[in-house]
Amino acid sequence: MSQQIIEEIERRYMKQDVPEFDVGDTVRVGVRVVEGNRERVQEFEGVVIRKRGSGLNQNFTVRRIASHGIGVERTFLVHAPRVESIQVVRRGKVRRARLFYLRGLTGKAARIKERR
């Protein structure tokens, strides 16, 4: 009984326009950022190295290489109000559910094959 009530409340806050993406895909996430008194959308593009959770608590981690070869990882809640958009740039072909091994790779070794 209580589980049904929780699911009903969660369903109210879940987004409907979330694209289907998987680990290994390159995604572009638009995040709403507040700077002083103005608000803008900041794009963060990278490879999805982890997906976890389900329902309202579903989240994913995106990794990209920033300037000077420094790796940056950000974790986003799929249904968070700050996440403006999720756009799949390219589909990756991987055989793992977690791509933490990419943290130790640089350059061409960190490339992921494209799914056809």
From Swiss-Prot:
Coiled-coil parts of chain? none
Report one GO cellular component: cytosolic large ribosomal subunit
Q: Tell me one GO molecular function of this protein.
A: structural constituent of ribosome
GO terms for biological process, alphabetical = translation
Question: Which UniProt key words apply to this protein?
Answer: Ribonucleoprotein, Ribosomal protein
What's one Pfam family here?
Ribosomal_L19
> Which SUPFAM superfamilies is this protein grouped with?
Translation proteins SH3-like domain
Purpose:
This protein is located at the 30S-50S ribosomal subunit interface and may play a role in the structure and function of the aminoacyl-tRNA binding site.
Q: Family assignment?
A: Belongs to the bacterial ribosomal protein bL19 family.
Name this polypeptide is given: Large ribosomal subunit protein bL19
The encoding gene is rplS
